[in-house]
A protein has these predicted regions:
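Glycan-recognition and catalytic cores of secretory/periplasmic carbohydrate-active enzymes
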Residues: 2-157
Length: 157
C-alpha cells in the first residue's frame, strides 16, 4: 500500500498521497519494528505480534524506496537499506540464491521459497525490483548483484 500511495502521487500529483505513504511507512517503522530491526507482521489492540515473513520485508522495502523517491527524505532510503540487510540475514539462501519465505528460527522440515507470482507478485520478484531500485538510486553495485542472485532460482524452474 505504501508503494501504491507513492506511485499515486507520481501520477496524480496530489500531496495527500505522499502524506499517506509517509504516515504508513512511519507507522510501521515506529510500531512494527523490533529493537534489532526485525519486523512484525500484525498490529492489534495497540500491540505488534507475529514475526514478519519474507514477503512482508520485500513489500516494505519496495514501499520505503518509493517513498524515498517522492519525498527525497534520506531516512526512508536508510530504512530501506537496513531492512534489505535484515531480510538477507534472516531469509537468504546462500547455497541456491533467492529468499526463503520464513526465517530459520522455526523447526520446519522444509523451508519454502516462492519464486513464482500468484494473486500478488512473489516476494522474490518484489525484492529483486527493490534491490535494483536501490542500485539505481545509490550506484552501489552490491544491490545489483544481490538482485541477480535473488533471481537465480527462477531460472531453474
Amino acid at each position: 500500500m505504501i508503494d501504491a500511495f507513492a506511485r499515486a502521487w507520481q501520477r496524480m500529483g496530489k500531496p495527500e498521497y505522499t502524506e499517506a505513504a509517509r504516515r504508513a511507512a512511519d507507522f510501521i517503522l515506529t510500531n512494527l519494528r523490533k529493537k534489532d530491526g526485525a519486523l512484525y507482521r500484525t498490529w492489534r489492540d495497540d500491540k505488534a505480534e507475529i514475526a514478519a515473513y519474507f514477503e512482508d520485508y520485500a513489500f516494505m522495502i519496495q514501499g520505503l524506496v518509493s517513498t524515498y523517491r517522492v519525498t527525497k527524505e534520506d531516512r526512508y532510503l536508510q530504512a530501506a537499506k537496513e531492512q534489505a540487510a535484515k531480510a538477507k540475514k534472516l531469509f537468504w539462501d546462500e547455497k541456491h540464491g533467492g529468499y526463503y519465505f520464513t526465517d530459520g528460527s522455526e523447526q520446519l522440515l522444509v523451508r519454502m521459497k516462492n519464486a513464482m507470482d500468484s494473486a500478488i507478485p512473489s516476494g522474490n520478484a518484489v525484492m529483486a525490483q527493490a534491490l535494483l531500485d536501490l542500485y539505481e538510486i545509490t550506484g552501489d553495485a552490491e544491490w545489483k548483484q544481490q538482485a541477480k542472485r535473488c533471481l537465480m532460482p527462477t531460472g531453474r524452474q
